[in-house]
Amino acid sequence: FDQRRLPVPKVLAVSDDELCYLQQDLGSVSLFDALKGGREAGGRYNVKEKELLIRTIRQLPNVQIRGARGLDFTQCYPQPEFNTDSVLFDLNYFKYCFLKTTDIDFNELKLEANFRMFANDLTEEKMESFLYRDFQARNIMLDAKGNPWFIDFQGGRKGPYYYDLASFLWQASAKYSHKLRRELVYEYYYSLKNYTEVPSVRHFAQRLSLFVLFRTLQVLGAYGFRGYFEHKKHFIDSIPPAIQNLRELLHDNKFPYPYMVEVLEKITQLPQFAMIEQAAANRSDGYKVTDKNIYPAHPQDGPATFSKYDGKGPLVVTVYSFSYRKGIPD
């Protein structure tokens, strides 16, 4: 990665026995820290925070595509490649660590058949790209200029680039709005064009939805294990937002796995996973957060204008202009 000048920390020195090494200090500010205001405000990100997200998502194809060139994937641990076996492992992790804890009755054989169809679809397109595996805001450091640097990619392997995009944008705790996700997918797609051939927008969106579904089930399996079996409250609290992602995903897409979808819909209907609407906290930086509609206007009036600090308006702009009828005088 260093040879390709990717935004990753440089290894400065390695001990003779290769058990210790020194690497570049990237500071203490992560993207997760920088996005705290928008995250705690219920997903209402300001312009600066959105710019950080755009910078990050534009750099992701650089790591995925250029980072894969000349990389010996046989050295990747614990898996050299994203394959059917690893997908089935994660799907069964979801089944045993989450689904079975809900006491929903389901047919094991029918669900397994759909799992195999799903796994085959996820792995049918072979790609020469680096799958970061744990691409999240906590693993992105920011320098003084706000440029992203990537860490904790040691679990990476060869695999489809859709996976990392799904992991990043559909992380439940981030609370990204549908509009913001769409904008960031757009930024990623057009950045990807700079590094490799890309499929049509329609095909890209269809493939991405499969990986969003897979990543959601994978996350629920992890939350189930950490929360229900290891009794860690943070992971239990993270389950309802993840279920909401699943609920929206099933509503917006038609997946060709009828029995699996049937079981997943039963999960989303369970009362313990109902989303409880919480009022967003006011931001410490003065960015206005309100549950009210601050855009009241007649459609013919054009877009509304308002102050982000008090939600009041309209903004009045007076324009003065002049011209020289016979040109600029001498």
Per-region residue spans from a language model:
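ATP/Mg2+ or Mg2+-diphosphate-binding catalytic cores
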Residues: G221-T290, Y295
